[in-house]
Every structure is written in C-alpha cells, then in structure tokens.
Design a protein with these regions (language model features):
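Short, ordered loop/turn segments at secondary-structure junctions
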Residues: 9, 67, 109-112, 223-224
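Mobile, glycine- and charge-enriched loop segments
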Residues: 38, 63, 69-81, 184-191
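Short, hinge-like loop/turn segments at secondary-structure boundaries
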Residues: 122-126, 186, 237-238
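Active-site/ligand-binding-proximal alpha/beta "capping" segment
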Residues: 164-202, 207, 216-219
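Structured adenosyl-cofactor binding patch, chiefly the S-adenosyl-L-methionine
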Residues: 205-248
C-alpha cells in the first residue's frame, strides 16, 4: 500500500487533500486512478486508509474509509548526531536511521571530518537529505517524517544534547560491555536519547574530553571497529529492540 504524508489541516470532514510534489507522483509516476487505495499519515499516530475520489489541478482528493492508531514509532525520541562522512554515505545513514525509528538526524562538523560544507552547499545537502528522509519514512510506514537539521559544530551538538534524558557516545577505547549494557537497560519508553557518532577516523581526544565533561556517556559497540555508517545503525537497532520489547 502506498503511503503519503499531509499536514493535519489537510484532513477534514472525512476527506484528505494531498498536495505538493506527491500530486504529480500519484498521477503521473504511479498512474493511480480514482477508486484506488492508499494510506495517509498526518504527523500523529493515526493512519488513514483512503480511496482516491478525484484529481484536481493541484490536489488529490481522497475519501477516508477508515483509520487506526499506528504502533510504527519507537516509544522514545532518538536523535542521531552524525559526524559528516565522506562521499554519499550520509544518504545511506539517513535512509537506514529513518527505517530504524530515529526522531531526527543532526549532522556534525568535527575535527576529523574531511567534508566541509559552505552555506550554499549545506542548504542544498539538507534539502536533499530531507527528501531521502521522506522517502524512507514512506517506505517504512512511519507516521511522521524525521527532520534532518542544519549542520552543527561539535560544541553546538554537545549543547544541543544537554536537555536529553540519555546522552551516549560510542568510543573505541571504551571496553566495559557490562557498563554499556547497564546504561542501555536504564532507558525507558517516553525518554529522549542522543547518540553521537564520529566521522571516518572517529573523535579526537579533545572532543571526547568535552563530551565526558558535559555528561555524555561513553559506550562500547563490541570488540570490532565499525565504520561510521554502521555504528549509528548498531545503536539504533539495539534501542529499537529494547524499547519495543517493553511495549509490544
């Protein structure tokens, strides 16, 4: 079943009005016709099962057949602070993070990051990355589109993490798996979690010291050295399992 997103104001009186680029996609790419069915989310935990009623110039008007509460979201807010990786790895990271239930992705510029974005390039990248997030949210049946936020410096990212309930930083020199396990098991539904992942080459000692001074807890991901595009997915997978097993 095809899945689309609308604002809450586009759901009214038993109808859904789909607008924007999705109109062309539904009409000319998917070649859907009146009478065909699709699912719509409005950013809440509700899924609307709809039937296309008619096409207007800039809208697809759908009739709501039924609705149900969705349990697709992890019962916590998870923020991935990702050091800027090389090439197009960020696209893969965003896609998989959204599939695994992340709330938002915050790119970071760190001391060992090779990639440096000026304002123009950053604007273009953020737009593209949010498009990838939307596509991944549709594919995975999310009820909202996780945002890819503007790039932060490492110190800005540390400050951004401060209000979160749990702040974690996987670090290759952290070897205490028992402590990591204990920390992860303290995370409860309804809480917020920040995960800080370095680029290729990881974090330098000053960044690690800064993180520890601000209450960000080091954890280990095991005895193997993981690529930057693997590390965040490993933590997200563990959190998905731990949090969903307590609510399913």
């Amino acid at each position: 079943m095809y899945h689309f997103f609308v604002d809450r104001g586009q759901v009214n009186a038993g109808k859904v009005w789909i607008e924007g680029s999705d109109v062309n996609h539904i009409r000319n790419v998917l070649r859907m016709r009146p009478g065909e069915k699709l699912d719509v989310s409005d950013g809440s935990n509700t899924i609307y099962h709809c039937e296309i009623d008619r096409f207007e110039e800039c809208q697809v008007v759908c009739e709501i057949l039924s609705s149900e509460e969705s349990y697709a979201e992890i019962p916590a807010q998870i923020y991935l602070f990702q050091g800027l990786p090389k090439a197009d790895k960020m696209e893969l990271i965003i896609q998989k993070a959204v599939e695994l239930g992340v709330t938002a992705v915050i790119p970071m510029s760190t001391s060992r990051a090779v990639v440096k974005l000026d304002a123009k390039k950053e604007e273009s990248k953020i737009k593209r990355w949010n498009g990838i997030s939307e596509s991944a949210a549709k594919q995975s049946g999310r009820t909202f589109i996780p945002q890819v936020e503007p790039v932060l410096s490492f110190k800005q990212a540390v400050e951004r993490m401060q209000p979160l309930t749990h702040k974690l930083i996987p670090y290759e020199l952290c070897e205490n798996m028992d402590e990591t396990r204990r920390l992860l098991y303290t995370i409860k539904p309804g809480e917020s979690i920040g995960i800080m992942i370095g680029p290729e080459g990881g974090f330098d000692k000053d960044e690690i010291s800064c993180a520890l001074e601000h209450g960000i807890m080091p954890i280990t991901l095991g005895r193997r050295i993981l690529r930057t595009e693997t590390a965040g997915m490993s933590v997200l997978s563990v959190l998905m399992f731990l949090l969903e097993q307590r609510t399913c």
